[in-house]
Amino acid sequence: MPLRPGRCYRHFSGPAYTRKEYIPGIPQPKITKFTSGNPNGDYDYEVRLITTEIGQIRHNALEAVRTITLKTLTKRTGSETSFFMWILKYPHHVLRENKMMAFAGADRLQDGMRLSFGTPIGTAARIEKLGEILIVVKVKKEHLDFAKEALKIASKKLPLRTRIEIIPLRPIRQEVQS
């Protein structure tokens, strides 16, 4: 069966389903790298993507956010060593689906609500508090607009509303005009 839309898994109720030692057949998360770029660089600004809603983000949405942010920053800044990107959320929660068929004769093949616990279909990261940080990008002053643009594009790949916050890592010097 095809993958359901992300809106089916955006909201949650109940505790997280994370005990992987008791769950057979969990697919691996699509997102594997959580840091990119140069972590030891000398940066001026930290740009953050912060959630303004509570919900779940599937692992394939996190991977889409990572790839589009990395691609945009690498293309606009010229190299992967001129920034540092860090994704802070990990998809621990296991998503289940009780597969239901909707075609002629499907009633002979499926069990309905009998044994309806569902099989694992993927994982998701839970956002349980407002204002949780999803992505941190550290850049120099000349690349600040590129980082904002990359996170704005990335926010469109997420099922939750977000905002962008810019934090200077050094005190801003005031230029004296004489």
From Swiss-Prot:
Q: Which InterPro entries match?
A: Ribosomal_uL16, Ribosomal_uL16_arc, Ribosomal_uL16_CS_euk_arc, Ribosomal_uL16_dom, Ribosomal_uL16_euk_arch, Ribosomal_uL16_sf
Among the entry's GO cellular component annotations, what is one? ribosome
Q: Which residues form a coiled coil?
A: none
GO biological process assignments? translation
Which Pfam family, just one, is annotated for this protein?
Ribosomal_L16
Would I find Metal-binding among this entry's keywords?
no
The UniProt keywords, alphabetically, are: Ribonucleoprotein, Ribosomal protein
| UniProt similarity note | Belongs to the universal ribosomal protein uL16 family.
NCBIfam families documented for this protein: PRK04199.1-1, PRK04199.1-4
Q: What is this protein called?
A: Large ribosomal subunit protein uL16
| Source organism (scientific name) | Saccharolobus islandicus (strain L.S.2.15 / Lassen #1)
